[in-house]
Structures are given as C-alpha cells and as structure tokens.
C-alpha cells in the first residue's frame, strides 16, 4: 500500500461503489401506483371505501412501537413542534434540549415561541447528560426533550425519574432511532410522547415525513388538531366521497400532514426495517472490534439498551493521535480513501452556522427575550470535545458486507498511521 494518503494524491483504499440509500422495499412501486390511481392523494381527500394510507401507516407504526396512538406528520421538525404544542409549551417557557444534535432540536423550541436551554451530553453516548439537565432546571422549565443520537439510546431511567420528580413532560426525539429498544420497550414509547423523522437519510424514510406516537389518547387528539388545521379524524365511518376530517373547533392548528404517497411508501418500508436494522447491527459490531484495534473509541449506548439501531456510526479518534488536526480534516482524508462521506459529528448547536435566531425577524421579541435565546450564553465542553474528535459514517455503509467493514477499518488505520501528513 502506498504511504501517501488519497487526499494528497495517493491511491485510495477503495474505488468500488457502496450501497445506495434509500433502498425501496419490494412493494414500494406497487403501493405508489395504487395511490396514483386511487382518487385520494391526501388525508383531506374524499373517502373511497377503504382505509387511507395515512391510517394504515399510523396503525402499523403504533403497533410496531407498542403504543395506542400514532399521528403522521410532514417532517421530524413538524413532529417535535406538534408534541411540544400538545404539551402546552408556549411563549417564554424553557425547554431543555441537548447541545449536540441536529439544529432542529433548538429551532423547534424557538418555533413554538419558547426558549431552548442547551445542556451538555455524556462523553461516551453523546446523549443528554441527566446531571447537566438537573443543573439547568428553573421555575420556567416546562419540558425536557431527549435525543437518541446516532446509535445510542439515552439514559432513560435517570431522565424519566428526573422528569417525574419535577412534574415535567419528557419528549423523546427518535429521529435517529427507529426500532431501538430500552429495557425491552421501543424508544418513543418510554415517555410522554415520541417523535420521528422519515426524511431521506433516515433508516425509515419516505423522502420527507414524520410521526408522533403516544399512549395518551387526549394527547394524540391534540396532535391531530394541531397538524390538520384544527381538524381531527372522524370517530365513526363516513360515507363514500366524504371527508374523514371533522372541524371541531377545539384547537387551532396548521397543515403539517403527510401525503398518501408518503404514507403508502412508509407502510412498505416499515416491513423491511427490522431486517435492515439487523444487518446494520451485525456490521457495526464487527466494525467496533476492527476500529478498536486501530485505537478508535466507538460510540457506546446507555446501560439498559436492549436493541441498538444505527442511523450513524460514530467513533472518537485514537487518544494521543491526530491531535494536530480536527475531525473535519480527518473526515476529508477518510472520504478520499473510501469514496463516501465521512464527516465530523454535529457541531454544538450553540455555534452551528445553521442556528442563528438573530437572522429571523420573528424572534426579535424584545431585548429580554433575545438575551434568553442567545446561544452564546451556554458552555458545552463535552459537546465541543466530541465535535473536535469524533467522525461519523452514514448507515448506508452498514448495509454492505464484512469485506466492506474491513475496507472501512483499513482506511481508518491508514489515516492514523499517516496522520502526520495531514494539515488543517
């Protein structure tokens, strides 16, 4: 093998293609064709004598997660906002969120006129640190949002106990954890409600989409109203050609519904989710061993995790190695070796260029409010260290075979051994 790195003009470890994502389920095309000719393309379309695809997916996803209620929504972002609004969160309320996550963890709180309070994470799981949450609570705290990040499930025993002790709703952001379990219970079913994203990159995808799940019938009814312009599904059968949404006037909402095309696709993709998750899990276990041999520290999950899933495979750089460069430079080198993106983990939301409340006039609600939502007021040392020293691989690579995992490990080892050549 050449001593020079591919990023500097050397030969890469691999030139063969990697698995593509998304991968359509066997019945996906047939399901989409069925919607196309059904005469109903949305939940607000007329009843045609059969259950809507939206209802079919809602029932299937609720059953899959072991809960009574699922309300599909337009996106993971919409789902988070719906869940927060269903909790009654609004102007001036504080919501605890992790500092290490996609920017939606903060922007959704702003979107309901509340104040995101960013907390540090556990250095091994990269999920919300219960001790940091405890320290951040104030009389204005109205909810805690926990994100199951990358491939880890958060410390739900401690977080649930904390939320219960303070009488706070606990919301699970499961956008990256479809199918994961904690003490035998699916994530999303462990707290007040769980929210999901079905965006293009997710392990269960319809391109865009989301869902809120809960065991609470009244909570689900509020979510239904909030996502369908104040309307909810009829509690009894309607006649052919009639709309299934009823205008109750109970709660004003907006349109955050999925289309019948998205719902039909999700019904089919749900059928292959467990099989795909198992393949990722098997390959990730091999990769854990291979990368540990090279000195990397793969992300761990909380004690109590009974089924782990992988949206992203994350690993910390070897101790004492590559200290002269950041994870972005290492990711660029690994990308050149492997031919697919290897990226640093999320930047802390507080300094993410995509999170800037000052850029939106809607958040200019006075000096006091603007001071409270200023992300610069938070210090997140664990988030900062993770961003500097952690690289990530998208789950599509984990749908390969064992030889693919060996290629990944070879590239990771090569970059460590020749890391002195890197700059940046």
Swiss-Prot record:
It is an enzyme of class 2 (transferase). Keywords: Aminotransferase, Antibiotic biosynthesis, Pyridoxal phosphate, Transferase. The modification N6-(pyridoxal phosphate)lysine is found at residue 202. GO terms for molecular function: pyridoxal phosphate binding; transaminase activity. GO terms for biological process: antibiotic biosynthetic process; polysaccharide biosynthetic process. Its EC number is 2.6.1.100, 2.6.1.101. Its cofactor is pyridoxal 5'-phosphate. Coiled coil: none annotated. It catalyses: 2-deoxy-L-scyllo-inosose + L-glutamine = 2-deoxy-scyllo-inosamine + 2-oxoglutaramate; 3-amino-2,3-dideoxy-scyllo-inosose + L-glutamine = 2-deoxystreptamine + 2-oxoglutaramate. Transmembrane segments: none annotated. Catalyzes the PLP-dependent transamination of 2-deoxy-scyllo-inosose (2-DOI) to form 2-deoxy-scyllo-inosamine (2-DOIA) using L-glutamine as the amino donor. Also catalyzes the transamination of 3-amino-2,3-dideoxy-scyllo-inosose (keto-2-DOIA) into 2-deoxystreptamine (2-DOS). This is L-glutamine:2-deoxy-scyllo-inosose aminotransferase.
């Amino acid at each position: 093998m050449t001593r020079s790195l591919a990023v500097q003009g050397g030969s890469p470890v691999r030139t063969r293609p990697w698995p593509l994502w998304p991968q359509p389920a066997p019945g996906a095309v047939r399901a989409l064709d069925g919607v196309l000719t059904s005469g109903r393309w949305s939940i607000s379309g007329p009843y045609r004598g059969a259950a809507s695809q939206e209802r079919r997916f809602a029932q299937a996803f609720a059953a899959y997660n072991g809960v009574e209620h699922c309300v599909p929504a337009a996106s993971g972002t919409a789902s988070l906002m719906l869940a927060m609004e269903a909790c009654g969160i609004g102007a001036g309320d504080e919501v605890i969120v992790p500092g290490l996550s996609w920017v939606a963890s903060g922007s959704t709180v702003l979107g309901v006129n509340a104040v995101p309070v960013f907390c540090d994470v556990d250095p091994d799981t990269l999920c919300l640190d219960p001790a940091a949450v405890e320290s951040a609570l104030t009389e204005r705290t109205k909810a805690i949002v926990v994100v199951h990040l990358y491939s880890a499930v958060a410390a739900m025993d401690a977080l649930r106990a904390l939320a219960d002790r303070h009488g706070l709703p606990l919301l699970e952001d499961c956008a990256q954890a479809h199918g994961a379990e904690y003490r035998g219970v699916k994530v999303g079913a462990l707290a007040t409600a769980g929210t999901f994203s079905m965006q293009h990159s997710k392990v269960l995808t319809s391109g865009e989409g989301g869902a809120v799940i809960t065991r609470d019938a009244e909570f689900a009814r509020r979510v239904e109203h909030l996502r369908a312009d104040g309307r909810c599904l009829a509690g009894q059968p309607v006649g052919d050609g009639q709309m299934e949404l009823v205008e109750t006037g109970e709660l004003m909402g907006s349109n955050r519904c999925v289309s019948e095309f998205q719902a039909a696709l999700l019904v089919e993709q749900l059928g292959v989710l467990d099989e795909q998750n198992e393949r990722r899990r098997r390959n990730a276990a091999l990769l854990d061993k291979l990368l540990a041999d090279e000195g990397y520290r793969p992300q761990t999950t909380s004690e109590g995790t009974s089924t782990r899933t992988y949206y992203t495979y994350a690993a910390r750089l070897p101790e004492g190695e590559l200290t002269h460069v950041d994870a972005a430079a290492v990711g660029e080198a690994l990308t050149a070796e492997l031919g697919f993106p290897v990226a640093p983990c999320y930047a802390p939301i507080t300094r993410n260029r995509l999170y800037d409340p000052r850029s939106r006039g809607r958040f200019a609600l006075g000096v006091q409010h603007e001071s409270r939502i200023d992300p610069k007021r938070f210090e997140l040392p664990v988030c900062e260290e993770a961003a500097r020293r952690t690289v990530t691989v998208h789950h599509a690579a984990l749908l390969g075979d064992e030889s693919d995992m060996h290629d990944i490990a070879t590239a990771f080892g090569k970059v460590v051994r020749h890391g002195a050549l890197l700059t940046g």
